[in-house]
Amino acid sequence: ERGFSMVFQNYALFPHMTVRNNVGFGLRMQGVPAAQAGPRIDKAMAMVRLSDQQDKLPGQLSGGQQQRVAIARAIVTEPTLVLMDEPLSNLDAKLRQEMRQEIRRIHLQSGATTVYVTHDQEEALSLADRIVVMRDGRVQQVGTPGELFDAPIDLGVADFMGFRNRLPGRILARNGAAVTIGVRADTASPSDPHCGELTGRPRQDSLGDKVVIAVRPYDLTVQASGRPGLGVTVELTEYLGRGYQALGRTSDGQSVHFACDRLLSPGEQLVLAADPARALVYPA
């Protein structure tokens, strides 16, 4: 009656019905005659590439196939709106990536407006035309994936957009469009010594203000010895295939995640610098 369909996290397929009957269930509830329903079911099945599986039961399908059945059931009624509630959370990483591409393709082919709920940054960026970030029931920011990725409005949105490092400190100096931050966990007094410096892109902050600098791991680089920056002691290094990512700790105990080009040894002393254009500064 409301003109929208929903795809659930747990698929919610009828286990005793064939794939075809699951897809056509909404049409039967709407009283669509069989002669009209048949071609629409065929179209939806073809759209999700399951025409050859229509006589099977859901239990005979893989998780990805079951999810596609749920999507076909949602679009077969030709709704004006489709709501997808974390539909990929039960799938493994490889299948999630494949299904993201399938959902995008199906969305473009069906033309239905789709609201997709997710806690996954990659899903949001790859699927959305516009992203709405919400926290505690309130809208934090609305924009295109590029707008939110490059300029999150606050630390909450920055966290969702992959700014894994969020380090407190005070503004020490301004250099054109950038500021230098003295990083320190306890910023009670401007005269307190800091454990290192990072340069970032500020908003409307003044010298001496308490701030938080947010930076993604791959926007931190290892500096040559003697260069200014943020000193860390290496705790561990992970090999990620395309490179390495390390966890370091500052002299005042803050953890710092950063990219590197080799396997680092625990206890190794390094100095890190941030790309000023990619490190964002927020009020504390």
What residue spans do the PLM features occupy?
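ABC ATPase nucleotide-binding domains
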Residues: 1-159
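Non-catalytic connector elements of ABC transporters
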Residues: 164, 174-284
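Short beta-strand-centered aromatic/proline hotspots
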Residues: 169
